[in-house]
Amino acid sequence: MSLDRVDWPHATFSTPVKRIFDTQTTLDFQSSLAIHRIKYHLHKYTTLISHCSDPDPHATASSIAMVNGLMGVLDKLAHLIDETPPLPGPRRYGNLACREWHHKLDERLPQWLQEMLPSEYHEVVPELQYYLGNSFGSSTRLDYGTGHELSFMATVAALDMLGMFPHMRGADVFLLFNKYYTIMRRLILTYTLEPAGSHGVWGLDDHFHLVYILGSSQWQLLDAQAPLQPREILDKSLVREYKDTNFYCQGINFINEVKMGPFEEHSPILYDIAVTVPRWSKVCKGLLKMYSVEVLKKFPVVQHFWFGTGFFPWVNIQNGTDLPVFEEKEEESIEQANAGSPGREQTSTRFPTSTSMPPPGVPPSGNNINYLLSHQNQSHRNQTSFSRDRLRR
C-alpha cells in the first residue's frame, strides 16, 4: 500500500463516511492507512517549504497546471464571499449568512471540480468534494478549527496522490496554502466564525496549527541566519514586515489584529515558544509533535475526518484489512439523511456516551505542552516558568 500514490486506475472512490465515534475508534485511526498518508504528506510539504524561505508574495501562478486549477477553484470560493455579504446586526455566535455561503459552495463545488479535473478522473469528485468542502468550517456550528485546516491539507494530498503535482516545489506549497489561509481569515472576519473545539487561552491558536508548522519550517534550514528569530515574533512591526512571505508571521499577525491585551496573556503557548525555544528547527520539531497529540490523536478534532475508499481508506496500514466499523444509531442516520449534503460534516452531537478523552474546551496540561515544545539543554527556570505563570493566572 503506497503512501504517495493511489493505485490508479484500480482504486475505487466513494462518498466519505464517518468512522470515528469514540476513544477506541480514535485509536483505530492511528493504525490506518489514512493517517499514515496524512503524516507522509505533512512531512513532504513541511520539507518542501523549508526550501522556500523567501517566496514571491506577488506570485499568482505555478508551472504545474493542477496547482493553477486548484487556485482557480479557491478564487471562485473567494468570490462567493463577495456574493454573500454578512447579515446586518450583532451576532454572538457567527453570522448566519455563512450558511448561505456554504450552501452555494455545496451546490457549485462538484461542477468546479469536474471542470478542474481531466474527464477520466471525475470518479474521484465525491471524495475530493468532501475534503475541500469541509476545509472552510462548519455550516451548522458556524465555527472553524484545526480539523478543517487538516481537511485542506488532505485535499492537496489527494490531488498529489493522483500524480497531479509533478515536480512540486516549496513555492507551489506556499501558493496553495497562502491562497487558502487568505480566504479562511476573510471568512472568519466576515462571518465572525467561532473557534472549533478551542482550548481557549491554553490552545496554541483559536483556529490554526498547521500554519505555524509550515512557517517555522520555512526558516528552519536558516536557523540562526533566519530574518527573524523566534523571540522576535513578539515585535509587531517585524511580524508585519514578514507576514506576506512567512506563514508563522502570518499567523501571529492575524492574532495581533483580532486580539487585545498583552500577547503573553491571550496567547501564552506561542509566547512560551518565543521566549524559550531559540531555533526555528526546534520550533518546527516541537510543533509537529504537538500536532500529532493535539490534532491527530484528539477525538473532538478527528471525529469529523471521514473516510472514502480511495484517498484515505479506513484500512489497516499493516495488512490492508478493514478496521472495525460501528453502526450509527438510527436517529443519527436519520439526522444525516435530513441534513443535506451527504459527505459533509453536519453536526457536533455525535459524541460517544463515555470517553476518557477531554471534551472541547478542556486545556492540555502544562506539563504536556512543555514536553512537546522542550528543547535540549533548556534551563530548569525555563521549564517551570510557564507552569508558574499558568497557576498565577
UniProtKB/Swiss-Prot annotation:
GO molecular function: peptidyl-prolyl cis-trans isomerase activity; protein phosphatase regulator activity; protein tyrosine phosphatase activator activity
Keywords from the UniProt entry: Cytoplasm, Isomerase, Nucleus, Phosphoprotein, Rotamase
Matching SUPFAM superfamilies: PTPA-like (SSF140984)
Null allele phenotype: Sensitive to high hydrostatic pressure (mechanical stress); simultaneous disruption of SCH9 exacerbates the effect.
Localisation per UniProt entry: Cytoplasm; Nucleus
Span list, region Disordered: 328-393
Any one annotated GO CC term: cytoplasm
Top class in the EC scheme: isomerase
Remarks, miscellaneous: Present with 4590 molecules/cell in log phase SD medium.
UniProt-listed PANTHER family: SERINE/THREONINE-PROTEIN PHOSPHATASE 2A REGULATORY SUBUNIT B, SERINE_THREONINE-PROTEIN PHOSPHATASE 2A ACTIVATOR 1
Subunit structure: Interacts with the phosphatase PP2A-like catalytic subunits PPG1, PPH3 and SIT4. Forms a ternary complex with SIT4-TAP42.
Protein name in the entry: Serine/threonine-protein phosphatase 2A activator 1
Gene name of this polypeptide: RRD1
